[in-house]
Amino acid sequence: MPTAQLLLLACLLWGLEARTAQLRKANDRSGRCQYIFSVASPNESSCPEQGQAMSAIQDLQRDLESTKARLSSLEGLLHQLTLGQAAGPSESQEGLHRELGTLRKEREQLETQARELEVAYSNLLRDKSALEEEKRRLGEENEDLAQRLEHSSQEVARLRRGQCPQAHSSSQDVPAGSREVSKWNVETVNFQELKSELTEVPASRILKESPSGHPRNEEGDSGCGELVWVGEPLTLRTAETITGKYGVWMRDPKPTYPHTRETTWRIDTVGTDIRQVFEYELASQFLQGYPSKVHVLPRPLESTGAVVYRGSLYFQGAGSGTVVRYELTAETVKAEREIPGAGYHGQFPYSWGGYTDIDLAVDETGLWVIYSTQEAKGAIVLSKLNPETLELEQTWETNIRKQSVANAFVICGHLYTISSYSSPDATVNFAYDTGTGRSRVLSIPFKNRYKYSSMIDYNPLEKKLFAWDNFNMVTYDIRLSKM
């Protein structure tokens, strides 16, 4: 009983403290008195059912498992940290330094690439500006060329109305093969390629006249002597297309009908199949660049060694050591002759090259051929040719190496050579006398005004040197001593 009282007293005190306890008294079924007290749950508003309690327990278990997992993770981290501290701080610092160095290198590489891209972009902008400027300049040049072309077309039309009809009247005598080539139209591509920049030179300066009104040096007046002086070059015209960089132009020192001393022939020698020979009946037509006729050779020629003499064109056949005689009026080949042992196609050229192995020349005494052979070991060989049959009448072997000189020509039976094809201040450096068989050193100034003389020939009728200097057709006055 005292125990029950104490229990009751404790419950009362706890109930008073909790302020939610309730005490009630009642008889049970047997009539015994029972004391019953209740206390409110501090967390739950109502008593959970059995299923809810199980769910709560499962939630607690999951929380506990999660807590255990986190605790295990923390223990693992603590273990790793402990191992790292045991290994010493230096290794960790070194690893960090290495990683930091790698990152710095990558940053420097990225910065370098950025700078290079900026420079490339700047260069592109500059190139773009330069291209735009070039485009503008080319547009202006195109407009200027169009104006010049229009002016040239008008000039051609004017000349056709005035000066050129006589060229058509003579075409009846031309064979059919050449008649087709001789029909020039201002709109054709061939005609446009023949356009040239003209240098106005009075005809009186080209064909100097004596007081009687006739040109000097008529046939029978040999005027022979040794070369002592060469004047400044006089430019007659300039070829416009690339085919005119090298070439040969000539007049016949002994013209035959229907050609005159004014008739001029021109050949552009850039190319592999050189067959066209442009004929200009008048000196004015040559200066203006309007051919009166175009010959098409039956076989191609090679290099710049051709000459015209007594109505025939003499030239070296391409890829051979053969000299060909082509009669200009009949437009047929009259003779061919292989020069014995002569080098060709680059074996013994002049110093500028150009397959100038065989070079023909004309002087007061007739027709010559300049070449070399294996037997002569590259020295110049000079032979006199029969102009009809091309037989060698006489031959001289000199001691002048052909590849050491730029060009050669013959005056009054004397062979003269030029020291350089490109130097503005070249010289006539050697002379060989066929009369004595001796050579001598000279130092006569010779001007290569345009620095690429590919052809130099002597015209005994006009007493001038004709030359082709880097697209330009020029002449040189000369002075000969008295024999």
UniProtKB/Swiss-Prot annotation:
Top-level taxon: Eukaryota
Please give a single GO biological process term from the UniProt record: signal transduction
The protein's matches in SMART domains, at most eight in alphabetical order, are given as: OLF
Positions annotated as glycosylated: 43
Q: Which tissues express it?
A: Expressed in optic nerve head, ciliary body and retina.
Question: What does the UniProt PTM comment say about this protein?
Answer: N-glycosylated.
Query: Is-annotated flag, keyword Nucleotide-binding?
Result: no
* Coiled coil segments of this chain: 51-162
| Gene Ontology molecular function | fibronectin binding; frizzled binding; metal ion binding; myosin light chain binding; receptor tyrosine kinase binding
| GO terms for cellular component | cilium; collagen-containing extracellular matrix; cytoplasmic vesicle; endoplasmic reticulum; extracellular exosome; extracellular space; Golgi apparatus; mitochondrial inner membrane
Q: Which PANTHER family match?
A: MYOCILIN, OLFACTOMEDIN-RELATED
Q: What is this protein called?
A: Myocilin
Instruction: Tell me the organism.
Output: Canis lupus familiaris
| Gene for this chain | MYOC
